[in-house]
Amino acid sequence: MGQIDFSTITTAFTDPAAWLVAPIVLVVLFVVLLRPRRPGARGEAAVARRLRRYCAAVANDVILRDGRGGLTQIDHLALTSEGLLVVETKDFGGLIFGKTHDRTWTQCIGRHKRRFENPLRQNYGHVKAVQAVVPEVQVTGLVVFMDRARFPRGLPEGVTTLSLLQQALPLTNAKSIHAAHREAWDTVISHVLTDRLSRDAHLVIARRRKRGS
């Protein structure tokens, strides 16, 4: 049976460098373990993986200026053979009722009902923000629900589920990307706001809108 080398343990506790690093490690672990998960993050991650598989390029959690003095947050932006695709992910379950032009849709889980903003209308604003940057190329929108969601009256146009996502996407490969589409993609990416201040500002705006809805 091997003997424990207590000298190694003693060195670890007496080494000044170890005492300097230890608090940093503890803080990082604390932040990672206790940081609240953003609502819908798991669903967005699942959609992002599918998009990377079937699209030429994908950017996630994109923040752009909306052209009206504000900011807009896009779950996913993808480059396809037909142009740019703006994707809104909804990690909802239960029965979903809503039509294309309704202001709000309804989620039903058992006896509980909850109204939420029509995601097609919500994503339309995202599409317009991208079009403002690259008006010369086609920009389309798509809303993706998780497979836990059911649509008793059928999927509205422009809406799909995770398992049907591939069927809703245009066939795309590296050779099918037009140079103008690639240039438009690069232009939009160059307009993406990545600084923390912009992201914090968007969160404040989103919370105000939620309180006012």
Short names for language-model regions:
Residues 1-72, 79-84, 93, 104, ...:
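Surface-exposed interaction regions that form or flank ligand-binding interfaces
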Residues 90:
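Ligand/cofactor pocket segment of small-molecule handling proteins
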Residues 96, 100:
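Polar interaction faces of repeat-based domains
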